[in-house]
Amino acid sequence: MTVWTGNDAHLDMFNEIADDFIADHPTVEEVTFEVLPFDNYIEALTVQLAGGNPPDLGWIFERNAPEFIEAGVLTDLAQTLEEAEDYGYDDLTDAATELWREDDGLYAYPFSTSPFSMFYNADMFEEAGLETPTELYEAGEWTWDAVRESGAQVVAEGAAPHGFVVRDFEFQLWDNLATLWRGFGAEEWSSDGTQCGMAAPEMVEAFTFFHEAVFEDEAHPGPGQSADFFVGDSAMTVTQISRAADLEDEQFNWGVVPLPEGPAGDHQVVGQGAIGVFNASPNAEVAAEFLAHMTNEENSRTLAQFFPPPRESLLNAEVLGETNPLLSEEQLERVVVDGIATGTSIPTHVNFSVLQDTIRAELDAMWTDDADVEAVLQQVCDVAEPLM
């Protein structure tokens, strides 16, 4: 199975689940988890598929779901999961599995439906004499404006090298900024994927806000600046709640809150990771059986300590709290349960790989201090819409 996590706690958990499967399947000698770099995961996986050397199973980003399903490279898992002993197929929620279905088939299992959230370093806020995001949230004042203001202030006070950072964005993965622009009421394209929304007034407002946060306020690191919240480089970071695992051994006080409100109100965003079985695998049948084992009700409880499951019975703070010692029930309710209930997916498109590269290239003109935001976004649409 190809994965994009190198986290030891994740891999140890996967290997324990695999060992149980091997014990009950004498013809299976080994289950291996191949870590591919996050930044070029899909490219590396595609090379394996095109080269006739596919993995048996692989993780798939939600943004690439329509492409993989339309390409016909994934095995329909519905019958295998329905017939697996003690699986509880009907427990899978329609909302979580919708992206991975076509007709009556289920072509990947969304093992993680993980809301984006804002982690913060409470020690840095205390040093700067600022209210924490939790205090702002509870006062009804948790907004993108507050993020920008407090991000600039915590840097000005010398309490943090950087204010806030949209993790994994790095001025390359532009679609991660959906965590911001959804709060402005912006959409990257129409619901049928045929019309570009990148030049709409709401998107211009969102990108103007972000551009000013980077180049005027210096609240967010600029191009070429690396900032990792988890090693103390920033006071806040936008990332998925599953990243809480990276805080297990941290030496600073931290908290986590939902994404802030924008001019369009409260708009939460979720990301999904799914596991698919590849048709071209010589072990596709047993790979599907392993997937059924890995994601049965019992193992879903185990996975839930890092990856919010698509199971109705497990999506409540009390159950999630049993395997999430790092997060309080209140945090789980606010960020995970409510986020999954109300959140929308980050951008997906049947032609996403081409659009991702095209839009990234056009947005390069945005990342200078004197950029014409509206003109850049119009150019994005001029180039991207014909590809939709």
Can you annotate each of these PLM segments?
Residues 27, 208, 212-219, 248-310, ...:
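Extracytoplasmic/periplasmic substrate-recognition and gating elements
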Residues 150-152, 191-222:
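Glycine-centered hinge/linker elements that transmit conformational signals in sensory
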Residues 20, 24-91, 108, 127-128, ...:
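Extracytoplasmic "Venus flytrap"/periplasmic binding protein-like
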Residues 101-111, 116, 126, 143-195, ...:
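Extracytoplasmic/periplasmic solute-binding protein
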Residues 62-117, 145-146, 255-257, 323-326, ...:
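Hinge/lid segment of periplasmic solute-binding proteins
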Residues 101, 309, 330-383:
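C-terminal capping/gating helix-and-loop segments adjacent to ligand/active sites or protein-protein/ligand interfaces
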Residues 78-92, 135-139, 162-166, 186-205, ...:
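Short, solvent-exposed loop/beta-turn-alpha elements that line the ligand-binding surface or hinge
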Residues 227, 242-245, 275-353:
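Mature extracytoplasmic/periplasmic domains
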